[in-house]
Amino acid sequence: MARLAGVDLPRNKRMEVALTYIYGIGPARAKELLEKTGISPDLRTDNLDDDQLSALRDVIEATWKVEGDLRRQVQADIRRKIEIGCYQGIRHRRGLPVRGQRTKTNARTRKGPKKTIAGKKK
């Protein structure tokens, strides 16, 4: 089983799809990565040789933050916004949607289950 950036890539998937299992690499970045390394997108993960695997590893480490580093960076950005007290930081602190979505209805994922108020009738 091929292992890149601390993630076991699925054996029987095409490389284009298998690379998206790494946090921080989506379909577009996977295509770009395969073009840089000259690996066919249709190649299966279990058909990779060691040279191709090391080429992928080198390009990923040199070019992008992925997995743990990226997760830490995102959390640090959120903490910084909370500390400086900007609008997005306040929304994070209150557990509300950050990017301008409506909250009168919807937003249940972010707000959690409904809190019923006793004595409120129509």
Curated annotation (Swiss-Prot):
Transmembrane segments: none annotated. Residues 95-122 are annotated as: Disordered. Coiled coil: none annotated. Keywords: Ribonucleoprotein, Ribosomal protein, RNA-binding, rRNA-binding, tRNA-binding. HAMAP family: Ribosomal_uS13 (MF_01315). Part of the 30S ribosomal subunit. Forms a loose heterodimer with protein S19. Forms two bridges to the 50S subunit in the 70S ribosome. Located at the top of the head of the 30S subunit, it contacts several helices of the 16S rRNA. In the 70S ribosome it contacts the 23S rRNA (bridge B1a) and protein L5 of the 50S subunit (bridge B1b), connecting the 2 subunits; these bridges are implicated in subunit movement. Contacts the tRNAs in the A and P-sites. NCBIfam families: uS13_bact. Belongs to the universal ribosomal protein uS13 family. This is Small ribosomal subunit protein uS13.
